[in-house]
Amino acid sequence: MPDERTTGREGVGAAVLAAGFGERLRECGRPKPLARVAGLTLLERTVRTLRAGGLEGEIVVVVGHRGEEVAGHCKARGLPVRVVENPDYPRGNGTSVLAAMRFLPERFVVAMVDHIHTPESVRRLLRCEGDFVAAVDTRPVYADPGEATRVRLEGGRVVEFGKNLPRYDGLDAGLFLCSRPALERLREASGGERLSWNDLKRAWLASGGEVVACDLAGAPWTDVDTPQDLRLSEEMVLGWAASGNDGPVSRHINRRISRRITRRLLDTPLSPDQVSLLSFALAALGAGLLAAGRLRLGGALVQLASIVDGCDGELARARLESSPRGAVFDATLDRWADALIISGLALGAGTRLAAAAGYPALAGALLVSYTRARWEAALGRMPSRFTGLGATRDVRLAVLALGGLLGAPGAALLATGALGNAEALRRLLALKRGRS
């Protein structure tokens, strides 16, 4: 096992409990922390979620059952964690929390390796104050109340934990923010035959300690205990991986196809950047066909490029690989693709109308992107009323694709120019009214 000497740490740390038997997942043939959901093992997903949620301190992974395999996976994948072996793990996961504490800073998160959360839930937890904070969900969507630990709440505090509470107000979401000095007082409660994390929580309440409730209020999360849970968890992850800024074409048409493509890409070595390049290549090929007068085939490839353009973001969000650098890379390729498609359609049409409509169409496409980028750089997030119909790339590409498929390139270019320039003008007028 790796070196276990205590070192100095900055910020909030985390203990990831990964020592249990995972008996109902044994048919998968690997330790539970190494079961895969949407392209990542449960352990990788937990570590990436914590980091993406803003956790900066050391992450301690506590192993027990088949611990050498889990530790080897951490090393092979280059996970930035400290692995700590807990020989006492058969007594319960409470012993894993105690085993991790001496390697952790004063405030730390306790995360279950078999619970899947979004980074936003971690951010919400880290904003809470208290010696013991529990993430709870009063409006669970994915988690099974028959499997999860239930909680009873009073005045924003958890007053009771239990699997079989007849009356309860929410579910324990398996994510906690704790104070190490406070929990050290519970070591004296650790001498029994069994010591689960629920036992420690109840001991904390019995000692007069308060458990602050951090309500996730319907945020997507679930716990994974069975092969069926693995499948349901992947559906959940793909559901939240869709962009929240979809236009109507993406929302009602493209996502239904891109999600199926992304599902097949999750366990491949393809990166989101490579998928961005694939989308650009399809757009460039479609533009070339449009310029050569092959309008129907070119239009079909333009729409396919639009569908694949959604896969890079889905893949990045599902694998927790999103980054500002990747967003800039994708946006730059998109602008080049737009210019090629509009130019190709204008050239391939061979009419004065299409040639004349090419410039305003290209200007409108670029201005929609440019005004949004400048707005958000100077003023923060653009209000959703300025990112609707005509201001989304999916609509623009659908109009251009239809122009090729229906043999109406001039009309498609005129519509694209009108939509884009009208939206850019609307944004400018809104800014002017805001200054006056």
Curated annotation (Swiss-Prot):
| Ranges for region CDP-alcohol phosphatidyltransferases | 242-435
Read off the InterPro entries from this record: CDP-OH_P_trans, CDP-OH_PTrfase_TM_dom, CDP_ALCOHOL_P_TRANSF_CS, GlmU-like, MobA-like_NTP_Trfase, Nucleotide-diphossugar_trans
Q: Name one GO cellular component term.
A: membrane
Question: Which parts of the chain span the membrane according to its record?
Answer: 275-295, 349-371, 397-417
**Organism this protein belongs to:** Rubrobacter xylanophilus (strain DSM 9941 / JCM 11954 / NBRC 16129 / PRD-1)
Residues in coiled coil? none
Which PROSITE patterns does this chain map to?
Answer: CDP_ALCOHOL_P_TRANSF
Describe its membrane topology: Multi-pass membrane protein
- A GO BP entry: phospholipid biosynthetic process
Name this protein carries in UniProt = Bifunctional IPC transferase and DIPP synthase
- Entries under Gene3D superfamilies matching the protein: 1.20.120.1760, Spore Coat Polysaccharide Biosynthesis Protein SpsA, Chain A
**Gene Ontology molecular function terms on file:** nucleotidyltransferase activity; phosphotransferase activity, for other substituted phosphate groups
